[in-house]
């Protein structure tokens, strides 16, 4: 069963030179689609940041599409992706398919304003940063202060991207807060709900 979960489909393309095969993610990358599927961690962050930088180098004016299905994960890994999204010149359009929770929703709202979306049955979730520490009391206090600073930074960024006051964001993030896709639009996390693909 584990091998099936790690199976990556291959696609075959015909051209004048013959057949070429790609793993599905490489094929999507050619269409400027990055798929963030699973836990937000250092490995995922490295892959997503590298793909963002590669696509910007190819064409800094064409949008990049970041499709998200994630329960979240490590805050610093998510912030690395966030900073890269803001740093590159190419606009990043975000779309939630499935769920965007915790750092997943944070990355969803970090997309280009007007181009942040979710599919109709997507589940969105926001909360304050989580952490746990062990050790000497003085070290625990240092970590707690750092966690408070991270919480303030994330609150400011949600407020900036969602058009809310920091006080509103802090109240919402105080406990686990789930939203439907439509509620995500109303809160400012996303801009629209896609019922079907736009005609191109």
Swiss-Prot record:
Coiled-coil stretches noted in the UniProt entry, renumbered to this chain: none
Annotated catalytic residues: 102 (nucleophile), 127
GO biological process: protein quality control for misfolded or incompletely synthesized proteins
Cystine pairings recorded for this chain: none
Record InterPro entries: ClpP, ClpP/crotonase-like_dom_sf, ClpP/TepA
Compartments it resides in: Cytoplasm
Primary site of residence: cytoplasm
Lineage top rank: taxon: Bacteria
UniProt-recorded Gene Ontology molecular function terms: ATP-dependent peptidase activity; ATPase binding; serine-type endopeptidase activity
Record's keyword terms, sorted: Cytoplasm, Hydrolase, Protease, Serine protease
Reaction equations catalysed: Hydrolysis of proteins to small peptides in the presence of ATP and magnesium. alpha-casein is the usual test substrate. In the absence of ATP, only oligopeptides shorter than five residues are hydrolyzed (such as succinyl-Leu-Tyr-|-NHMec, and Leu-Tyr-Leu-|-Tyr-Trp, in which cleavage of the -Tyr-|-Leu- and -Tyr-|-Trp bonds also occurs)
A Pfam family reported for this protein in Swiss-Prot or TrEMBL: CLP_protease
Described purpose of this protein according to its UniProt entry: Cleaves peptides in various proteins in a process that requires ATP hydrolysis. Has a chymotrypsin-like activity. Plays a major role in the degradation of misfolded proteins.
NCBIfam families attached to this UniProt entry: PRK00277.1
Known partners and oligomeric status: Fourteen ClpP subunits assemble into 2 heptameric rings which stack back to back to give a disk-like structure with a central cavity, resembling the structure of eukaryotic proteasomes.
Protein known as: ATP-dependent Clp protease proteolytic subunit 1
Organism field: Bradyrhizobium diazoefficiens (strain JCM 10833 / BCRC 13528 / IAM 13628 / NBRC 14792 / USDA 110)
Gene name tied to this protein: clpP1
